[in-house]
Design a protein with these regions (language model features):
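Catalytic-core regions of hydrolytic enzymes
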Residues: 7-144, 152
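Proline/glycine-rich low-complexity loops and linkers
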Residues: 144-160
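Generic alpha-helical propensity signal that fires on short helical segments
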Residues: 51, 90-92, 131, 146-150, ...
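Gram-positive cell-envelope targeting signals
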Residues: 1-4
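Active-site-adjacent mobile loop/cap segments within catalytic or ligand-binding domains
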Residues: 107, 114, 121, 158-222
């Protein structure tokens, strides 16, 4: 210890607390959950025939319910298996993506979590991975927190790191920190089975929820 000028002892070893600039109570935070694909767009098809759009929706609804229970304002880009386009749209995929971004803007989202599943030619490849917009520092921060949260709550053996991307439409055209959460590989038979299990889906929802809590400074460490 050293003596302060006013005669009181002070301790140089005590570091000041780091302020979380994003810290706000949950009821002041708008979160958009975006279940990827839908309608005529099935997304990836699993090793045993699982449809990504259905897995995405199931995980999204559980996640949304969990976040709502924590007090957050939750919005969805879709709540059913329909796509976000009109039958008359020539390019349904483009119309769908534009509509998703419109919903996000209308919700005045603070963060967006887009739920997806991965696939690869090598069926041994597995593990969740988060993607963020290359030029978004806050998106990177959220993705890093979420990647670690998946490692903690879903699979401690997952060595993947989050990854920057400047090509995905959803990352480029959203005005707030956005993470595309590739929750696992449907091309891996074991992981496909897990992704269709509600206990495992709840682990994913918990990982996402705890990541959001930490990002906004509402977790137990703050």
């Amino acid at each position: 210890k050293r003596q302060a000028l006013d005669g009181e002892a002070s301790d140089d070893s005590v570091e000041p607390a780091v302020m979380n600039e994003n810290r706000r109570p949950p009821d002041q935070i708008n979160i958009v959950i975006d279940p990827g694909h839908g309608g005529a767009d099935p997304g990836k098809i699993g090793a045993s025939g699982s449809c990504e759009r259905e897995v995405n929706l199931a995980i999204s609804m559980i996640t949304g319910e969990m976040l709502t229970e924590r007090g957050y304002n939750v919005f969805f880009t879709r709540r059913d298996d329909n796509g976000l386009y009109d039958d008359s749209d020539v390019n349904k995929k483009a119309a769908d993506m534009r509509k998703r971004c419109s919903i996000i803007e209308e919700a005045q989202a603070d963060v967006v979590i887009s739920i997806h599943q991965n696939s690869f030619t090598d069926s041994d490849v597995c593990g969740a991975q988060m993607f963020y917009y290359t030029h978004s520092a806050e998106g990177k921060k959220l993705a890093e927190i979420m990647q670690e949260s998946f490692r903690k709550f879903v699979n401690t053996d997952n060595t993947r790191g989050c990854k920057a991307n400047d090509l995905y439409y959803m990352l480029i055209h959203t005005p707030c920190p956005t993470v595309i959460a590739e929750c696992g590989f449907l091309s891996n038979p074991e992981e496909e089975k897990q992704l269709n299990d509600n206990v495992y889906r709840n682990k994913i929802a918990l990982a996402i929820t705890e990541a959001v809590e930490k990002y906004f400074g509402n977790d137990s460490s703050n």
